[in-house]
Amino acid sequence: MEKRVLITGVGFIGTNLLKLYPNADTLDIKDGQDICDKLPDKPYDQIFHLAAKHHIPTCEKEAEECIRVNCWGTINLLKTYPNARIILAASSSSNEIKSVYGLTKAFVENASQLHKNCLAVKFYNVFGEHQKLEGGAVTPKLIWHMLTKTPLEINGDGTQARDFTYVGDLVKNLKLLMESDQRGVTHLGYGDTIILNNYIKLIYGKMPKVKNNPIQLFDILRSESP
């Protein structure tokens, strides 16, 4: 019998995950569906909880809404589906908490302990198909500036280190983890970092002119999967 699957959050990663679960039900906060309110009354076997407020500068400005969706939305989901196998989207931002978003993802990791069959998975700078060029993610931002020939600005001197993860690899491993009996918290990344300036050269083919802005309070200098 085919397992009943729910995917919350059908943005960049959720859209790629749907390729592996074409018959899954979906729930997306962008469509006005509130995960803090009543959730679908169905006995799901497997749930991927990806829905979240994630743009870090916006989360800083709208902290209450970020906490409501990311924290209380997760608690609501865990309480609503006590018998499902659940994977929660965590983040490398909780490794060194410097933002409201990172704080909420640390909460998500700890909340996984409230459920008998739950795994929180920490993502590391995911890139790939269906990712919007606009927004705060590093890879699409660089590609957008290169294609539009617009001035590139970064925070800091470009010596930040990042572990970038291809979304195709990420979703395949999410499926494997869903079928496993692993619980608690785990990491999905390559464990191999690249310096931002070198990454810029890789995408552009050379080092373009860059405007270096001051480091922000929420900027993390090194993000690497163990």
Model regions: which residues?
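N-terminal Rossmann NAD(P)H-binding glycine-rich loop of SDR-like oxidoreductase domains
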Residues: 4-21
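Rossmann-fold scaffold of SDR-type NAD(P)-dependent oxidoreductases
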Residues: 8, 45-50, 88, 187
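C-terminal substrate-binding subdomain of Rossmann-fold SDR/epimerase-dehydratase oxidoreductases
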Residues: 14, 18, 146-226
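Adenosine-cofactor binding site in Rossmann-like domains, unifying the SAM/SAH pocket
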Residues: 22-39
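NAD(P)H-binding glycine-rich loop region in Rossmannoid oxidoreductase-like domains
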Residues: 38-68
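Conserved Rossmann-fold NAD(P)-dependent oxidoreductase catalytic core, especially the SDR/UDP-sugar
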Residues: 49, 72-102, 119
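Conserved internal alpha-helix in NAD(P)-dependent oxidoreductase domains
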Residues: 64, 68-75, 87, 106-107, ...
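NAD(P)-dependent short-chain dehydrogenase/reductase
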Residues: 98-102, 106, 110-162, 167-178, ...
